[in-house]
Amino acid sequence: MGYVVYKFEMLEKFCNEAFHKIGFSVEESKIISDVLLLSDLFGIESHGMQRLVRYHKGIEKGLIKLDAKPEVIFDTPVSAVIDAKDGMGQLVGHKAMEIAIEKAKQSGVGIVTVKNSNHYGIAGYYAKMASDAGLIGFSATNSEAIMVPTFGRLAMIGSNPIAMAAPAEPYPFFFDASTTVVTRGKLEMYNKMDKPLPEGWALDKDGHDSTDAPDVLKNIVAKNGGGIMPLGGSKEQSGSHKGYGWGMVCEFFCSILSQGLTSNKVNQGNKSGTCHSFMAINPAFFGSPEDIKAHFSTFLKELRESPKAEGQERIYTHGEKEVAATKDRKENDNRWRKFSLPLWKER
């Protein structure tokens, strides 16, 4: 399999121009591109530029509306609900977190939920927006059902990622993870590379372990049974109920509070209906932001310097690898996202 190496600036230019030619404004194209490129810079390739073709298809099919005008349908000093009107997820997500940040600066906390949206990229992008503003950020989203509940055999819940970011030194704390073992995007990458799935990731239509990526993806689309396991696998003994439960926590904050579509109804027919949740918390409402940041930074340092397991060189804290990956992929072209041509082939 051949690889093509790209400079970051080339990908940035391509991504912006592609979305602009599709029909988005220059400003909108930049927001969408920023979300995708941050994902690739952080090493989350499943949600990076490989999504561009999928978004284009969504627009062609009418799932994503270029002319959507998201509307705030409920508003208080600390909360809001937005109807995205089937618009691009990154655009409404960016706006929703901006609103949450402004409310948090004024009232201590801002919580915004969104319904009738589309895929919005990585949840961590929006949590990072709040952290970059000196606040504590949280974001989550539901998605088309891919998680099979514990003891079940039909996907009923999305990958339902949850992200949190907070200021710290020498780099911000950044956590972003799905509540499934892996995301659908990871399965798609294995499918496009003709690689079998690792054991413990997915289930077939009868609820048995499967390493067949094409079959699992086909069953997810057809709602024919099977899907991806919750964090913890498929058994309670390994903690399956915990990933299942976290998926439900995400679902509550996204689709229930917004009164939108639950994961098992997302992407039905000609509508996505994805729901998101955003939260910004102002640390100044709990004391000195600098003191809180210093206290957190001290604990993170203690974690990194705690005793290591035999054979291990270091202990990481969340956000450390993302910062290192970003620096590496911007400065060293040969280590930039290894886009391979098969990643773009159709299935």
Which role fits each region the language model picked out?
Residues 2-11, 257, 265-347:
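Catalytic-core signal marking the mid-to-C-terminal active-site face
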Residues 48-101:
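Active-site cofactor/substrate anionic-group-binding motifs, chiefly glycine-
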Residues 73-79, 83, 94-110, 210-232:
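Residues forming anionic-ligand binding surfaces in small-molecule and nucleic-acid pockets
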Residues 80-169, 177-178:
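A generic, well-ordered mixed alpha/beta core segment in the N-terminal half of proteins
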